[in-house]
C-alpha cells in the first residue's frame, strides 16, 4: 500500500485544484500561492472597482528544489510524454499521469496532466484530469494544449 501511494495509485485522492496549487509552487520558485479566481472587478464603464494581487500562502520547497523539478518537468515536454506541447510558440513544463483506480484490470485509467507555461517567467498553470479515458499523454496533454493555445492566441 505504501509504495502504491508513493506513485499516486491505490487510495491516493487529489483534486485538479490541489495539483494546480502544487504545480504553481514549482512555477513560483517554491512558493505556494493563495488561489484566487477573480483578478479584478470592473464597473460597467470599465473602471476598476477592486483588484486582487497574488499572495504567498507559504514556502513549500526551496528554490533549488523548485528549479530541479522545473528542469525535470521541462524534459517531459521537450522529449517525453508531454512532447505534444513542444514547439508551440511558448515553453512549457509538465508531468503526465496515468492513474489506475478500482480494479485496475477491468477499468480504464484516469488521464492526468499538470504543467505551466512560459517556463522562465510563468504565466499560467493547467491541471487536467480526464476520468476513465486512458493515458495522460494521449488524452490529458491534448486538452492542456488547447488551453495553453487559447491563452496565447487570444
Could you say what each language-model-derived stretch is?
Residues 1-56, 64, 73-154:
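Active-site beta-strand/loop architecture of penicillin-binding DD-peptidases
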